[in-house]
UniProtKB/Swiss-Prot annotation:
This is Phosphoribosyl-AMP cyclohydrolase. Its cofactor is Mg(2+); Zn(2+). Keywords: Amino-acid biosynthesis, Cytoplasm, Histidine biosynthesis, Hydrolase, Magnesium, Metal-binding, Zinc. PANTHER family: HISTIDINE BIOSYNTHESIS BIFUNCTIONAL PROTEIN, PHOSPHORIBOSYL-AMP CYCLOHYDROLASE. The gene is hisI. GO terms for biological process: L-histidine biosynthetic process. It comes from Saccharopolyspora erythraea (strain ATCC 11635 / DSM 40517 / JCM 4748 / NBRC 13426 / NCIMB 8594 / NRRL 2338). Catalyzes the hydrolysis of the adenine ring of phosphoribosyl-AMP. Pathway: Amino-acid biosynthesis; L-histidine biosynthesis; L-histidine from 5-phospho-alpha-D-ribose 1-diphosphate: step 3/9. It is found in: Cytoplasm. Its main location: cytoplasm.
Amino acid sequence: MSSGLDPAIAARLKRTPDGLVAAVAQQRGTGEVLMMAWMDDEALHRTLTTRKGTYYSRSRQQYWVKGETSGHTQHVHEVRLDCDGDTVLLVVDQVDGACHTGDRTCFDADVLLAES
């Protein structure tokens, strides 16, 4: 599938063998980490052009826009590429829960280590 992603951006991405990069969503203003999902070039292109968090579902093998069904949308303010080129950071305004469970973040449920 051809993507509309700027070739200069595409050239900087280091993808998995499946052609994906990790995408981390972070709440604007607080820095709270909300979720991690996957993007391919087209999902990143759609995110950059619409300012809506758009991801690629590995299980369904299709694109999804955060909040399209639930109403829990993400308005994207910034997109940053990490130093290795294998992860993008989306700085967003999240409406309601970011997690598909309804929790604010996908990292609320299982604390493996905490301050004692």
